[in-house]
């Protein structure tokens, strides 16, 4: 394939995913904006509860990762019977697991909030938000899974339409419920539940095109999907748990711990303007590489992954410059507390320096995922997060008593290390064998 063909194929998959991630960004920004207007306690609690919530989403993301790898290859190989069996099996499995975790989340939230070491003033807010979010887990599971199916089968624009609906509903309901009903801050979580329910129904309707009347369920298909997806799930689990550990480490700061936590929540939401496009190119790369491998074009799969990485990293670099230039204007929009605003700006100025490295390893990781090489991604995260970021952050804050800025610099170092390891793995091409 000519380089222009790679660029065209990459962009055809990447721009809808970028818009989808932009919708996710708008939802997150709206959540943190509304939480900040309610109060710094709610804003800090929201930042923690969302990390807790997405720990439960990990299984869905793992299944989706395995689904994309399997379905993208089956779709281009032209095996309609195997494709139909895979789609049906994945949907049934996802719905079942999602329902189990919804129930578990509802009953476990109160216990977890009592057990975890966070400021006492945040526990009540966390319990209420957590239980509401748990109610929507089963629908979120279906939404994630069916989005993966649609983009694997070259119906990414249908997925884009669904997420546009989810975005509009989530944002609109957020403002209405929080500010115009007695439910108050509950609306932050309730708007998510309602919108993902609607999105899952729309996507299930689209997925009918890939299912036959037999509705055959296959345990072997599920095992195959899980075997590819579980390292991805483990990777996301380690990432989410690491976020909670970082939250606890920062809670140990002797001064301004709540303000720092609120600033981190706000900073991450602003940073997601950069991170989510990288994830969009990651997901697009998984489909591109998977489709090309399904066609038997391994050399093209390798080159297509590189082209997608360079495109995505270039966009991330541009967005990084924009965020740095506008940080002092954006941060006050998310909080009316002067200390939170100042710490948010400090976080952005430091963390932005490593964004191109983040984009590089995340997007190349998408290509590896599409080929089914999810274990190397897992080992990369273990090295960067659990052997570098967490230990050094603990040493800086707990043992040495340094400020939060030391943690931000430690995060930059870990991004660089992960970029080096992922580039080396991709360049070796062992994942194509």
What are these regions (language model features)?
Residues 40-51, 126, 130, 189, ...:
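Small-residue hotspots at the loop-to-helix junctions and early N-terminal turns
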Residues 26-44, 113-120, 176-182, 240-268, ...:
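Helix-terminus/linker motif at the lipid-water interface of multi-pass membrane proteins
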Residues 12-31, 132, 143, 166, ...:
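Transmembrane helical elements of multi-pass membrane transporters/channels
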Residues 64, 132-151, 159-170, 188-203, ...:
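Short runs within selected transmembrane alpha-helices of multi-pass transporters and secretion channels
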Residues 43-103, 140-158, 261-327, 359-380:
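Small-residue-rich hydrophobic transmembrane alpha-helices
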Residues 1-17, 71-136, 169, 179-230, ...:
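Short alpha-helical transmembrane segments in multi-pass integral membrane proteins
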Residues 29-33, 103, 111, 145-149, ...:
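Alpha-helical transmembrane segments of multipass membrane proteins
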Residues 2-33, 37-38, 54-66, 70, ...:
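N-terminal transmembrane alpha-helices
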